[in-house]
């Protein structure tokens, strides 16, 4: 498998990759899985499945990565499947699948594959993949609209959540004091603050905040995360006259996520470009009423409104009303969230792998999976 980031990484793609590798390694026929991560934002620590070979000597260096990939190709024993965890790595993954003579599976997350790739070679190779795994129906539809890949080759595998790690808890008192949130009504969004992620909806929440204050004098907007777009958002909050109602936490450790979710009365992310949105699952698992967009993959994370409230991010009144409606809901994990549990994810992935492998007469047994992301 060729992948961008996984063990030690932040964000939804890294989380998906970790779950994907664990689920593949639990397949009864998987003797070994080899993963080539491209980057790691943190040190690669922690336990890995016994049958996972996680190649780390080429992290964060393009030339060393290419060398490691080439060395891996030359030393391949019999493998049965090549998985490409990000469309940017498709040329490498395709080369590996051709070399080994095995099927190639591409994983699609979100906007990275909603339109033709800037690399024309990638667009040509896309037509040659044997299967595609998409985290949502939205991403599958957007990908199919330009790629020409047939629907029977495109499988849906939504993200999953650890329902033991993320669970409801009372508000964390030290964090309440640190961020001066005692006796406040807290709206929360968690995500990277970068210009390429402006689709997540930070601006939309800021723009309705003055109107919410008229109804909720103690409301505060908690923005969890960091990035170069932070100064722009701070300036926008000032220009809207709500700077004193917006708290920027900066980057938080993964170990503190649950504690930060506990601070929220509503989790709100009215996005336009989410392929799925793992943060929705995390918030709901922690029992936080959740507001998402009906225009992107967020609606699938909320099971089309079964688990939370859907709004149109282009309609500020709708966003405001969605937040107000969510504040009327009682905290607690919604029924039906176990649809996104890891065991359910594992079963879905095993079924997809069995179908992909059985479709290829030369790949009846999974002896080795090469993962490229």
Question: Which ranges hold each PLM region?
Answer:
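Conserved donor-binding/catalytic core segment of Leloir-type glycosyltransferases
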Residues: 2, 181-200, 206-209
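Short His-centered aromatic/hydrophobic patch
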Residues: 84-90
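Short alpha-helical donor nucleotide-sugar binding micro-motif in glycosyltransferases
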Residues: 126, 251-252, 259-264
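Carbohydrate-associated surface elements
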Residues: 138, 160
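Nucleotide-activated donor-binding/catalytic signature segment of Leloir-type glycosyltransferases, i.e.
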Residues: 231-252
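Aromatic "clamp/platform" in nucleotide-sugar-dependent glycosyltransferases that forms part
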Residues: 272
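Short hydrophobic beta-strand element within catalytic cores of glycosyltransferases
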Residues: 289-292
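Conserved acidic donor-binding segment of nucleotide-sugar-dependent glycosyltransferases
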Residues: 304-305, 309-316, 325-329
């Amino acid at each position: 498998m060729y992948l961008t980031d996984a063990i030690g990484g932040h964000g939804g793609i890294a989380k998906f990759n970790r779950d994907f590798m664990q689920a593949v390694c639990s397949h009864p026929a998987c003797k070994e899985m080899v993963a080539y991560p491209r980057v790691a934002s943190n040190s690669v620590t922690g336990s890995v499945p016994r049958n996972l070979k996680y190649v780390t000597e080429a992290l964060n260096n393009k030339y060393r990565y290419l060398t490691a990939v080439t060395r891996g190709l030359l030393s391949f024993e019999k493998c049965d499947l090549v998985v490409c965890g990000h469309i940017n790595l498709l040329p490498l993954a395709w080369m590996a699948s051709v070399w080994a003579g095995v099927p190639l599976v591409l994983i699609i997350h979100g906007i990275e594959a909603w339109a033709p790739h800037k690399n024309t070679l990638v667009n040509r190779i896309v037509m040659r993949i044997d299967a595609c795994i998409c985290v949502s129906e939205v991403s599958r539809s957007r990908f199919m609209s330009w790629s020409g890949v047939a629907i029977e080759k495109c499988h849906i595998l939504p993200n999953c959540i650890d329902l033991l790690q993320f669970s409801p808890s009372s508000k964390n008192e030290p964090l309440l004091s640190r961020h001066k949130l005692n006796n406040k009504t807290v709206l929360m969004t968690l995500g990277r603050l970068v210009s390429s992620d402006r689709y997540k909806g930070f601006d939309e929440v800021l723009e309705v905040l003055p109107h919410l204050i008229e109804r909720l004098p103690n409301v505060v907007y908690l923005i969890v995360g960091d990035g170069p777009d932070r100064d722009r958002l701070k300036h926008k909050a000032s220009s809207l006259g709500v700077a004193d109602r917006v708290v920027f936490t900066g980057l938080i450790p993964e170990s503190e996520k649950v504690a930060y979710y506990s601070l929220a009365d509503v989790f709100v992310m009215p996005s336009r470009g989410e392929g799925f949105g793992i943060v929705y699952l995390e918030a709901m698992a922690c029992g936080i009423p959740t507001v998402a967009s009906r225009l992107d993959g967020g609606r699938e994370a909320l099971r089309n409104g079964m688990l939370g409230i859907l709004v149109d991010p282009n309609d500020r009144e709708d966003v405001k009303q969605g937040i107000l409606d969510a504040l009327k809901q009682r905290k607690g994990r919604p029924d039906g969230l176990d649809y996104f549990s890891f065991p359910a994810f594992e079963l879905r992935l095993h079924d997809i792998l069995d179908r992909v492998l059985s479709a290829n007469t030369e790949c009846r047994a999974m002896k080795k999976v090469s993962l490229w992301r």
